[in-house]
Regions:
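Conserved serine/cysteine hydrolase catalytic core
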Residues: 187-238
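Gly/Ala-rich beta-loop-alpha elbow adjacent to hydrolase catalytic centers
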Residues: 98, 102, 106
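Catalytic active-site module of serine/aspartate enzymes centered on a nucleophile-bearing elbow/loop
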Residues: 241-283
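Conserved acidic catalytic loop of the alpha/beta-hydrolase fold
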Residues: 77-94
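Conserved HGGG/HGGXW glycine-rich cap/lid loop of the alpha/beta-hydrolase fold
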Residues: 15-68
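N-terminal cap/lid segment of alpha/beta-hydrolase-fold proteins
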Residues: 1-16
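Flexible "cap/lid" loop of the alpha/beta hydrolase fold
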Residues: 111, 117-155
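Residue in the alpha/beta-hydrolase core beta-strand immediately N-terminal to the catalytic nucleophile
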Residues: 59, 95, 118-121
Length: 283
């Protein structure tokens, strides 16, 4: 990690976005984190991929060290931000790997700007986020927003040590390499990110068929907290016919943290088969 670089680029709306980059001569792979995480949470994945790829970890708006505007946290804005970072760094047809919120961002980017990604990989982008069209707001939706607001607010009253201890109690199988960045990301999180709860829904049936690149969905076990169900995976594949689906057993929503070795095996295999074989070269 000593030779990794960090910096800022200006993206959409004049905002500054922080990134870390492994460098090297390999094809570019961009990592898009989930809600409340930041780019540093990808450190173990970046370390594993760095010998073969030029890995770029981006902090989304309101997360990590990127700017945190008061508004603009819809997935459309996040996708435009990520496209801007990719352009500013001069990356050509990068593979984009996104988890949860980052997975939804990656899908929107690939559908809206199909010439940007060389391949996309989605780690448990929630079935709720893949729902087709708009629907009425429900009591369950309102309660979910209230819980999220209370959780984000509660983070600010805890020290790094308290955050790590609390998460370790919930996920004792996570490594220290995961727990440290996880806690750091929560301490850097801006409350403004709660604005994403008021963002309009995405018209997925209209957007997703425009995705032209190879695509992979990595799923896990709903009984352990994974968000994408088998039905949700089938619905997504119906809209993105080239989508490959890889299931990682005994894992929940944070698949890479629960089953790191198997997760990296799946990611490496897809990148080698569908991305490097396409002749993508370093920027």
């Amino acid at each position: 990690m000593a030779d990794w670089t960090t910096g800022y680029v200006e993206g959409s709306d004049g905002l500054r976005f922080h990134y870390a980059r492994t460098g090297g001569g390999g094809p570019p792979v961009v990592l898009a984190h989930g809600f409340s995480d930041d780019g540093s949470c990808w450190t173990p994945v970046a370390r594993a991929l760095a010998p073969e790829y030029d890995v770029v970890m981006v902090d989304a708006r309101g997360h990590g060290l990127s700017d945190a505007p008061e508004a603009g946290y819809g997935v459309d804005e996040l996708a435009a931000d990520l496209r801007g970072v990719i352009g500013a760094l001069g990356l050509r047809r990068p593979a984009i790997l996104g988890h949860s919120m980052g997975g939804a961002t990656t899908l929107v980017l690939a559908g809206t700007y199909p010439d940007v990604p060389g391949a996309i990989l989605i780690e448990d982008a929630g079935a709720r986020n893949l729902s087709a069209g708009a629907r009425p707001d429900t009591e369950a939706d309102r309660k979910r927003r209230e819980r999220m607001r209370a959780w984000v607010t509660g983070l600010k009253g805890k020290s790094r040590e308290e955050l790590i201890a609390g998460q370790r109690a919930q996920t004792p199988h996570w490594s220290d390499d995961e727990l440290g960045p996880w806690a750091d990301s929560k301490m850097r999180l801006s409350p403004n990110v709660l604005g994403r709860q008021d963002a309009p829904p995405v018209d997925w049936p209209a957007l997703l068929p425009a995705i032209a690149c190879p695509a992979l969905l990595v799923t896990a076990d709903p009984a352990r907290g994974a968000m994408v169900t088998p039905d949700g995976a089938r619905d997504l594949k119906a809209l993105v016919p080239q989508l490959a689906v890889a299931h990682v057993a005994d894992a929940g929503h944070s698949i890479r943290r629960d089953r790191f070795d198997r997760y990296i095996e799946v990611v490496r295999d897809f990148l080698s088969r569908e991305y490097r074989s396409a002749g993508i070269v370093a920027a």
